[in-house]
């Protein structure tokens, strides 16, 4: 057959192609690239398994792959992939390539729309809106595409004709997509968010890989589950929540329930208010968003006992004080008489308790100046101002809308000032009369001498005097006598050399004696 030699020639050329890169570096040794030299020296036994180096891309010098998320450099400068680089950094040796085995494939039925319901349990077949972000579904598609583009499938096809090669490749890819899928070596599942490998290089699923890394043994098949439960990706729940929110927003706002009214008159008013809320179209101005508290006619209608528990909010505070809140008036006559201008006056209400009279305000800064107020009198009150306390009036004491505090029917006494006793002018003069001022010549009594009157004299404050003892006598010169002018004027005529007696020396006044008298 003439076609046999032509067919044998390309077959022989294809078999010799992996050998050509080995011969080229020997012939062109000075022009060898650093990526080819370590392959010849260190990894010569891997050349039969690795495909030839592409002319337009990069290739790992260890495993021969052309795709990696990060290219690295080995210590000898060669280009390696990310997996080989991480393995070398942790183990200080190159990653073994012979342990990498092709994944297992099993036949599956092709499903156009998929059977995954999207309720958080993924079976890897698609069919839901949430499958776009599902790692199990996406990894399954990527694994199928990588499997159909593997070099094993390319080498098995014979390059007889280019047209035939294209047709067979397209048919094979469609068959692979419909009938083949990667399966776990341990449990046989085809659904996993991440494919792993054990120490033997077998492809296992994420669950088996985590169990193997934790326990050091393969996961029992009884623990296998048909579906994978994902986290917080329930599209159905989100849709249901959105529908509920849209449904609630479309509905009209609910009118607040009518408060309990004590009288039929208030019921009619409340009915009018509800009618207004239903007829208005603008919800921002409708009164049902803010409804004022109902105004009860306390002065004309009694309050039922059944409504006290519903409206009463705070318990009444009662203090023992001369001022007391006005009771609920049950008739117009009493209300008009209690608010007469001559009988009572309005006092503003306060949240603080009254002054107790102990000199300090409760919760106040300190004592109050002035005496405490007088205690309330116990006199009888007129008939029209008597307060009749009943259980119903005490229970509804906190339901008053305008709280008017009135006094009792008494007039408070004036503030008592401390009494000051003032004596007459005659008695005060007799008791507190000072002795009259007398002249120097008069004597206070018969035994005492008259007051001493010293003539004005000049004192030299620079001179100092000392008193000598009785035994020692000092002689003063004329200059000393002139300096000390405290001597009597009668002794002016003295001899210059005559000594001065002690008595005469003592008669001289010093500053201390002058000041002390």
UniProtKB/Swiss-Prot annotation:
InterPro entries attached here?
Transcription_factor_GATA, Znf_GATA, Znf_NHR/GATA
Q: Does the keyword Disulfide bond apply?
A: no
GO terms under cellular component: cytoplasm; nucleus
GO BP field: cellular response to copper ion; cellular response to iron ion; intracellular iron ion homeostasis; negative regulation of transcription by RNA polymerase II; positive regulation of transcription by RNA polymerase II
Report the transmembrane regions from the record: none
Q: Which GO terms describe its molecular function?
A: DNA-binding transcription factor activity; DNA-binding transcription factor activity, RNA polymerase II-specific; RNA polymerase II cis-regulatory region sequence-specific DNA binding; transcription cis-regulatory region binding; zinc ion binding
Compositionally skewed regions (Pro residues) per UniProt? 364-379
Zinc finger residue ranges, GATA-type: 60-84, 184-208
Which domain of life does this protein belong to? Eukaryota
Extract the ranges annotated as region (Disordered).
Answer: 1-61, 147-172, 222-435, 472-517
Q: Locate the compositionally biased regions of type Low complexity.
A: 263-289, 327-358, 423-432
Protein's recorded name: Suppressor of ferric uptake 1
Q: Tell me the lineage of the source organism.
A: Eukaryota, Fungi, Dikarya, Ascomycota, Saccharomycotina
Gene name per UniProt: SFU1
């Amino acid at each position: 057959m003439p076609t046999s030699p032509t067919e044998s020639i390309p077959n022989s050329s294809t078999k010799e192609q992996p050998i050509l890169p080995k011969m080229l570096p020997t012939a062109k040794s000075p022009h060898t690239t650093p990526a080819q030299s370590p392959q010849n020296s260190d990894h010569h036994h891997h050349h039969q398994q690795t495909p030839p180096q592409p002319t337009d891309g990069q290739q790992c010098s260890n495993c021969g792959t052309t795709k990696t998320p990060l290219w690295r450099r080995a210590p000898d400068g060669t280009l390696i992939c990310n997996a080989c680089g991480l393995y070398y950094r942790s183990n200080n040796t190159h990653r073994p390539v012979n342990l990498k085995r092709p994944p297992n494939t099993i036949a599956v039925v092709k499903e156009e729309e998929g059977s995954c319901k999207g309720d958080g349990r993924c079976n890897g077949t698609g069919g839901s809106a949430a499958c776009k972000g599902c790692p199990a579904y996406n990894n399954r598609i990527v694994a199928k595409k990588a499997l159909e583009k593997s070099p094993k499938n390319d080498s098995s096809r014979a390059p007889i004709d280019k047209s035939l090669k294209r047709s067979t490749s397209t048919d094979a890819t469609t068959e692979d997509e419909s009938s083949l899928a990667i399966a776990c070596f341990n449990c046989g599942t085809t659904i996993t968010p991440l494919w792993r490998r054990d120490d033997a290089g077998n492809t296992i699923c994420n669950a088996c890989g985590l169990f193997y890394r934790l326990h050091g043994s393969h996961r029992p098949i009884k623990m296998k589950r048909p579906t994978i439960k994902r986290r917080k990706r329930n599209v159905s729940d989100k849709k249901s929540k959105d529908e509920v929110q849209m449904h609630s927003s479309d509905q009209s706002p609910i009118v607040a329930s009518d408060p309990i009214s004590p009288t039929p008159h208030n019921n009619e008013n409340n009915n009018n208010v509800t009618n207004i809320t239903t007829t208005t179209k603008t919800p921002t101005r409708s009164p049902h968003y803010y409804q004022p508290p109902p105004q009860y006619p306390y002065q004309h209608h009694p309050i039922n006992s059944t409504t006290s528990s519903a409206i009463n909010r705070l318990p009444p505070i009662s203090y023992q004080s001369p001022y007391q809140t006005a009771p609920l008036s049950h008739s117009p006559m009493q209300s008009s008489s209690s608010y007469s201008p001559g009988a009572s006056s309005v006092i503003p209400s306060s949240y603080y308790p009254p002054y107790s009279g102990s000199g300090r305000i409760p919760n106040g800064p300190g004592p109050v100046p002035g005496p405490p107020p007088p205690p309330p009198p116990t006199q009888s009150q007129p008939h029209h101002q008597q307060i009749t306390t009943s259980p119903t009036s005490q229970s509804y004491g906190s339901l008053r809308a305008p709280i008017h505090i009135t006094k009792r029917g008494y007039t408070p006494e004036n503030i008592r000032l401390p009494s000051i006793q003032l004596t007459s002018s005659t008695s005060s003069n007799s008791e507190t009369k000072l002795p009259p001022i007398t002249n120097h010549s008069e004597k206070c009594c018969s035994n005492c001498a008259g007051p001493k009157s010293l003539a004005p004299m000049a004192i030299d404050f620079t001179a100092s005097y000392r008193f000598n003892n009785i035994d020692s006598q000092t002689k003063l010169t004329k200059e000393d006598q002139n300096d000390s002018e405290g001597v009597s004027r009668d002794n002016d005529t003295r001899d210059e050399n005559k000594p001065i007696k002690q008595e005469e020396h003592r008669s001289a006044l010093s500053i201390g004696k002058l000041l002390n008298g």
